[in-house]
Amino acid sequence: MPTINQLVRKSRKALEKKSTAPALQKGYNSLNKKVTDASAPQKRGVCTSVKTVTPRKPNSALRKVARVRLTNGIEVSAYIPGEGHNLQEHSVVLIRGGRVKDLPGVRYHILRGTLDTAGVDKRRQSRSKYGAKRPKEAKK
């Protein structure tokens, strides 16, 4: 515990807030081959592998995860939300930040319904989160 005199001489240092999605904070200048500080809400990338991962205790499932190499050169693991997907190696995807609580090391989500990722079909509720189109009205 510092004395008042020590605090007067040298004040406390504020804690630096760490980003939850650090790969979205970096850009890449391909002309100069340099990493830049260009923050973005989403980033495009190419799938290097698509696999299933088992979650931490106490949950049990086979969660769908893709390894994605982003346009800034960083490779990350991203979760594929929804039931069923059409992703495979070399698919071009858009990722956003947001971790999956029971999958260690997965800090990003893949956006459904954009680029090579198809939306979830037969989805009626929360359609915008899964890239599903509005269903056609049935004839009366």
Curated annotation (Swiss-Prot):
Keyword Ribonucleoprotein carried by entry: yes
Region spans: Disordered: 1-28, 119-140
A single GO cellular-component term on record: small ribosomal subunit
Pfam families named among the record's database cross-references: Ribosom_S12_S23
CDD domains given in the database record: Ribosomal_S12 (cd03368)
GO biological process: translation
Ranges in coiled-coil conformation: none
Keywords, comma-separated and alphabetical: Methylation, Ribonucleoprotein, Ribosomal protein, RNA-binding, rRNA-binding, tRNA-binding
InterPro entries: NA-bd_OB-fold, Ribosomal_uS12, Ribosomal_uS12_bac
Keyword rRNA-binding on entry: yes
GO molecular function terms attached to this record: rRNA binding; structural constituent of ribosome; tRNA binding
Modified residues (3-methylthioaspartic acid): D102
Residue spans of biased composition, Basic residues class: 124-140
Record-stated family: Belongs to the universal ribosomal protein uS12 family.
Assembly description: Part of the 30S ribosomal subunit. Contacts proteins S8 and S17. May interact with IF1 in the 30S initiation complex.
Function: With S4 and S5 plays an important role in translational accuracy.
Name of this protein: Small ribosomal subunit protein uS12
Biological source species: Clostridioides difficile (strain 630)
Organism phylogeny: Bacteria, Bacillati, Bacillota, Clostridia, Peptostreptococcales
Gene name per UniProt: rpsL
